Regions:
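Short amphipathic beta-strand/extended segments with alternating polar/hydrophobic composition
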Residues: 44-50, 70-76, 123-137
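N-terminal export/targeting and maturation segments
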Residues: 22-62, 68, 75
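Short, well-ordered, aromatic-rich surface patches in folded extracellular/luminal domains
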Residues: 22-39, 98-162
């Protein structure tokens, strides 16, 4: 029985390793929510991006009916944040109703961007929401988020390899 358990655990570890996903350590950024209403997980005028705490992948998703609805999955590596930022740009416009869109680009709309919410997982598993002032520099905020997250995951991976 013990050998079967070990075999299953080894297979799961091998799958996660091959998938290119790395688990984010506690206390790091695990998500970002972009909102035009001031609420985290805005269903109507916003979208969310999170780093899944289970398999360590970056999910672009909407939060509806108290659960995440996955739209796309990007393994988080140091070169992937640009790809995720481009996807964030796309989803930022797609998440708005047609009448709210007035030009291409990141969150360019006649609606005022009210909040950028960073989501953290604390070492004690508490979820912490930190709202940033939305000052029109959202692209920079997103870029910094992805760079920081990629750096943290890369550092964690190196610590695990040592």
């Amino acid at each position: 029985m013990r050998k079967k358990i070990v075999a299953v655990l080894c297979a799961a570890a091998a799958f996660l390793t091959m998938s290119g996903c790395k688990k984010a350590p506690p206390g790091t950024l695990t998500g970002i929510s972009i909102s035009y209403s001031g609420m985290c997980y805005d269903d109507t005028y916003g979208f969310s991006i999170r780093n899944d705490p289970v398999d360590g992948c970056l999910f672009s998703c909407n939060y509806k009916d108290d659960e995440w609805v996955e739209l796309e999955n990007i393994p988080v590596e140091d070169t992937h944040w640009q790809e995720a930022l481009a996807l964030a740009e796309k989803l930022g416009l797609e998440s708005l109703p047609d009448e709210k869109k007035n030009s291409p680009g990141l969150f360019i709309t006649d609606e005022t961007l009210v909040s950028v919410c960073l989501i953290y997982k604390a070492p004690d598993d508490e979820i912490i929401y930190r709202y940033l002032d939305a000052d029109g520099n959202t692209r920079s905020t997103l870029r910094d988020f992805f760079e920081d997250l990629a750096g943290q995951l890369q550092t964690e991976g190196k610590r695990g390899d040592a």
